[in-house]
Design a protein with these regions (language model features):
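Alpha-helical transmembrane segments in multi-pass integral membrane proteins
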Residues: 3-20, 102-106, 135-290, 307
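Hydrophobic alpha-helical transmembrane segments of multipass membrane transporters and ion channels
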Residues: 31-39, 93, 232-236, 290
Length: 307
């Protein structure tokens, strides 16, 4: 949804330098990701004696660190250094695939009359193929094609929400619902059902302008703030969890109240760490120098724990 808003809000690619945009996306994704992985590698080394190998990732190899930095860890079958890092790699693949699909008609120099609809048609075709075929093949779950069904629904929902004619909007929503229902009839998948319902709700919300912050109640402000740091929170919560669990384990036998306090502390510390990660890394402009510096920090952390 958001990728469509930045790449082709009107169905025509608005990016002059696609490869530069791909690197920009890579930088935005990996800067906080590399910083969080560096913290995780160091925290895991401290927590390992208290929690054991089953809970804590093993000491990383150089190849494993390089693969994670290049977002190739799953494709190269390396064990993850933290929870959820597969999502970052898939998000980057999905963005690159979306950019390729939206930009292909321009490369092929389609006639002006077809230039607006060709990208939408390509996204629709690949999304349907993903829903009906690719998403049902477990061996493809390390690639963007496996997830593009849900991603494509979000892209299509954005374009549907911008339809000016009521009849066009209703027809597009009906087609979107029909495609999703057909995919679920072929093979029920709860995640696809959630993606379909979410896409339809977003299309309605965009149509009624509910997505504008001006229409949100004051009580939603804290949620907006949490949403702003949500990516950093997603990345940093695991090393915080490891650190708190190691501390609790080091206390020896304890009761449920200690576990409860540990959970509360984990949440509070995770939010605090996410704020620091967001302000110190994620909110800063992506640059080659910053990416290389953070990549080097990850490699150095691996060397530190290996000796």
């Amino acid at each position: 949804f958001l990728a469509t808003a930045s790449l082709a809000p009107d169905g025509v690619l608005r990016v002059d330098r696609p490869f530069s945009r791909i690197f920009q996306r890579y930088g935005r994704l990996v800067m906080p990701y590399l910083a969080a992985l560096t913290v995780c590698v160091l925290v895991a080394e401290v927590a390992r004696p208290w929690l054991g190998e089953e809970v804590v990732p093993a000491e990383p190899s150089l190849g494993q660190l390089l693969a994670h930095g290049l977002l190739l860890q799953d494709l190269l079958n390396y064990e993850s250094l933290s929870t959820g890092v597969w999502y970052v790699a898939i998000d980057f693949q999905l963005f690159a695939l979306a950019l390729a699909l939206v930009g292909l008609p321009a490369v092929l120099r389609q006639p002006t009359s077809a230039a607006r609809w060709a990208p939408v048609a390509l996204v629709f075709i690949v999304a349907v193929a993903s829903l009906a075929l690719f998403n049902r093949q477990a061996r493809l779950d390390e690639t963007a094609f496996y997830f593009f069904g849900a991603y494509g629904l979000g892209m299509l929902a954005f374009w549907v929400g911008r339809a000016t004619r009521t009849s066009t909007w209703c027809s597009a929503v009906a087609l979107l619902a029909l495609v999703g229902a057909g995919a679920l009839a072929i093979d029920w998948r709860s995640r696809i059902a959630i993606a379909l319902v979410t896409a339809l709700l977003i299309a309605v919300a965009q149509r009624r302008q509910w997505l504008s912050p001006a229409h949100w109640p004051a009580a939603a402000v804290p949620l907006q703030q949490l949403g702003r740091i949500s990516y950093s929170l997603f990345l940093i919560h695991f090393p915080v969890l490891l650190a708190v669990n190691a501390l609790v384990a080091g206390l020896g036998p304890h009761g449920p109240w200690v576990d409860l306090l540990g959970m509360i502390a984990t949440f509070g510390l995770s939010v605090g760490a996410a704020v620091l990660l967001y302000r110190g890394v994620e909110a800063r402009p992506a640059s080659l120098r910053s990416v290389c510096t953070l990549f080097a920090a990850l490699l150095v952390s691996g060397l530190i724990v290996s000796y």
